């Protein structure tokens, strides 16, 4: 009787929304599956694009998984995990963002029937982690090294990796053209990890084929004062001076007080201001530099002064561009014009100012360090150029990863089918429920070739049956067979040069499995009402302030 009289224990604030148990887990799985369905159709060379229109009126056309996930304003807490893994895949390897979201959604979809039948989530998580370890080991075993090849052979192999990535993008029609450009750019910077050494500059207008690669640095002409017309626009082997100071005549307006005993002294004060700027300009000229760049303003006086002495100058150069010139030309950015020595000056074979479309560009080519490159992108609509830039970023990341890791695997769903077959065979050696869970993981991996077929308009069931038959061959010669997008059948992905770096697949399997396990491990969601009640209180206070307090027990005046 005493136990029945115990008062109710209230832990959470009134209005807190809690949901738990099997229904909550299934709800989270459904939300993640819905997110997977959004990006599903963007996979592969025949994938469709998404047009996203935000509240500010800007329009984005993209089929890049990470870009779409960022722009979708997802509010479901579990589904946000898929947004995070897409972002991490993009920053880590650059490509495979749609793949990682699709795999995570498919792992959860396959887990759903087991959860509904009462299987404990931890049993699934344990089996999924085991399957993930086996899958990654198999990818490493099947990967082919590109180490030890000649430079030309290596370039050819890397171009194939870049072309595989670009084939699913908006610029897929010119994938060979851009793949070669990307490989040349990555090879130019060597082993340097700084991604900003490869610049991408967009110039609206013209054709995609009008895009070109600068073996050095190119940036849009900065704002110039009167007098720049007389400056030379081309130099051979010039010395380049990089500054981070203003070269502008400025009168001291604040914190300045001058007391004169004689009016004739006034002129000497004015002359001193002029002498300071002329002294700076003289030192720049004495350094022997023919090109002067500064991150801060170079005024009209300095512009005309340099023009009279056949020196080119540009002020307000973006910090990123200035640093890239320093890396390429071998100079050092100076914060003073005193004691400028030859060692701090950069150089290049050719400097020229050139018209590109409706813009003028300053181009430094043939730089001694050769550790920078710039891709100048041309195209019609702004949205098209934006998407082309994202596509090239993905391709650059992929090639850099392939250079570093030096291993590639067959694309077109071939590696996914081979891992799936391997896991099915392995599951037969395991007794108990775990056999079913690993088998469902293996089935989920088939989503990649199946979706490639669906997006291309082929009969996925027929193609998958052919692939299963080919991969089941004991000799192992069918291990590299994947979907042939051109014929609607199957083909050897290695022979067709459909390759991708092994690190992309390893990262995708790892991230997708971790995300699926994370969502499966959540059994309760608690929604705190604090923010909502705070907004309600604020609104109520405003209402009372406008006389809304009447009828609430307040005395009328």
Curated annotation (Swiss-Prot):
It holds the Pfam family Cpn60_TCP1. Residues 529-557 are annotated as: Disordered. It is found in: Cytoplasm. GO terms for molecular function: ATP binding; ATP hydrolysis activity; ATP-dependent protein folding chaperone; unfolded protein binding. The modification N-acetylalanine is found at residue 2. Keywords: Acetylation, ATP-binding, Chaperone, Cytoplasm, Nucleotide-binding. GO terms for cellular component: chaperonin-containing T-complex; cytosol. The keyword Nucleotide-binding applies. InterPro entries: Chap_CCT_eta (IPR012720), Chaperone_TCP-1 (IPR017998), Chaperonin_TCP-1_CS (IPR002194), Cpn60/GroEL/TCP-1 (IPR002423), GroEL-like_apical_dom_sf (IPR027409), GROEL-like_equatorial_sf (IPR027413), TCP-1-like_intermed_sf (IPR027410), TCP-1_chaperonin (IPR053374). It comes from the Eukaryota. Residues 547-557 have a biased composition (Basic residues). Transmembrane segments: none annotated. Molecular chaperone; assists the folding of proteins upon ATP hydrolysis. Known to play a role, in vitro, in the folding of actin and tubulin. Belongs to the TCP-1 chaperonin family. PANTHER family: CHAPERONIN. This is T-complex protein 1 subunit eta.
């Amino acid at each position: 009787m005493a136990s029945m009289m115990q008062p109710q224990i209230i832990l959470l604030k009134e209005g807190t929304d809690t949901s738990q148990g099997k229904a909550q887990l299934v709800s989270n799985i459904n939300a993640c599956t819905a997110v997977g369905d959004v990006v599903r159709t963007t996979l592969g060379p025949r994938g469709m694009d998404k047009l996203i229109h935000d509240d500010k009126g800007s329009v984005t056309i993209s089929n890049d998984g990470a870009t779409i996930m960022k722009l979708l304003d997802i509010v479901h807490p579990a589904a946000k995990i898929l947004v995070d893994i897409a972002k991490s895949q993009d920053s880590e390897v650059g490509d495979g963002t749609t793949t990682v979201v699709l795999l995570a959604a498919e792992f959860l979809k396959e887990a759903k029937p087991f959860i509904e039948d009462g299987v404990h989530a931890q049993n699934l998580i344990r089996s999924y982690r085991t399957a993930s370890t086996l899958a990654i080991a198999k990818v490493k075993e099947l990967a082919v090294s590109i180490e030890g090849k000649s430079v030309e052979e290596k370039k050819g192999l890397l171009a194939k990796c870049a072309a595989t990535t670009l084939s699913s993008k908006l610029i897929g029609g010119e994938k060979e053209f851009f793949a070669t450009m990307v490989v040349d750019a990555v090879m130019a910077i060597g082993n340097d990890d700084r991604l900003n050494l490869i610049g991408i500059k967009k110039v609206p207008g013209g054709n995609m084929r009008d895009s070109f690669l600068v073996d050095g640095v190119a940036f849009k002409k900065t704002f110039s004062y009167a007098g720049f017309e007389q400056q030379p626009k081309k130099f051979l082997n010039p010395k380049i001076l990089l500054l981070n100071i203003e070269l502008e005549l400025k009168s001291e307006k604040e914190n300045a007080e001058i007391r004169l005993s004689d009016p004739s002294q006034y002129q000497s004060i004015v002359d001193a201001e002029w002498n300071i700027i002329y002294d700076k300009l003289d030192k720049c000229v004495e350094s022997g530099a023919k090109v002067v760049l500064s991150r801060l303003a170079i005024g009209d006086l300095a512009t005309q002064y340099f023009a009279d002495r056949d020196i080119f100058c540009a002020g307000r150069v973006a910090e990123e561009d200035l640093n890239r010139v320093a890396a390429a030309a071998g100079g050092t950015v100076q914060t003073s014009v005193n004691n400028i020595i030859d060692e701090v000056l950069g150089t290049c074979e050719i400097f020229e100012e050139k018209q590109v479309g409706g813009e003028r560009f300053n181009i430094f080519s043939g730089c001694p360090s050769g550790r920078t490159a710039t891709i100048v992108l041309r195209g019609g609509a702004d949205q098209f150029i934006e998407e082309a830039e994202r596509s090239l970023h993905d391709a650059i990341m992929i090639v850099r990863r392939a250079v570093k890791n030096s291993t590639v695997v067959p694309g077109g769903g071939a590696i996914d089918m081979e891992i799936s077959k391997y896991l099915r065979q392995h599951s037969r050696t395991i007794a108990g429920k775990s056999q079913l869970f690993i088998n469902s993981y293996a089935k989920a991996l088939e989503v990649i070739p199946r979706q490639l077929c669906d997006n291309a308009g082929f009969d996925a069931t027929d193609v998958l049956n052919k692939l299963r038959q080919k991969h089941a061959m004991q000799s192992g010669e069918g291990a590299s067979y994947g979907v042939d997008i051109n014929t609607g059948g199957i083909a050897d992905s290695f022979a067709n040069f459909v390759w991708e770096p092994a690190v992309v697949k390893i990262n995708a399997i790892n991230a997708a499995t971790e995300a699926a396990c994370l969502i499966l491990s959540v059994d309760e969601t608690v929604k705190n009402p604090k923010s909502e009640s705070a907004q309600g209180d604020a609104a109520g206070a405003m209402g009372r302030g406008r006389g809304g307090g009447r009828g609430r027990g307040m005395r009328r005046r």
